[in-house]
Amino acid sequence: MLFRSVDGAQNAASAAVLKSAIRSIFKYKKLILVFGVSKDKDIKGMVNQLLPLAHKIILTRADNPRAAIPIYLKKYFAAKGKEIFITASVKEAKVLVLRIADSQDLVLVTGSLFVVGEFKDAYR
């Protein structure tokens, strides 16, 4: 069974609460972070909170004009030595998750309620 957690954390403070909750509630082998965010959010602050949890990172964007471009997001993650994937859509991110995650991994989808909603709706 692949575990999945979705959360609409969209600033550093809510990302810190999310990080604490993940650490206290879930047990997993690896955490795969699916991250997409609006370009007007505190991206650096969110990344600083969530990056320590992640083993693999999938950067994506919601179908929303305010969404940050995934290749732009990569600069916040790139120097940290994590495996990073870039997808053009949330649907593509979900396909990738299903390919790379195993039964002991936790998939965390966060950064934007738009991303969370699209992830939940993809291929229902």
Residue ranges of predicted features:
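Glycine-rich phosphate-binding loops at beta-strand->alpha-helix junctions
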Residues: 39, 65-66, 115
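C-terminal helical cap/extension that packs against the catalytic core
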Residues: 47-106
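Nucleotide phosphate-binding/pyrophosphate-handling subdomain across enzymes
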Residues: 1-56
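Active-site-proximal loop/hinge segments that shape catalytic or ion-binding/gating pockets
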Residues: 112
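Active-site-adjacent alpha-helix immediately C-terminal to a catalytic or transition-state-stabilizing loop
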Residues: 117-124
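A general structural signal for well-ordered alpha-helical segments in protein cores
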Residues: 15, 43, 70-73, 116
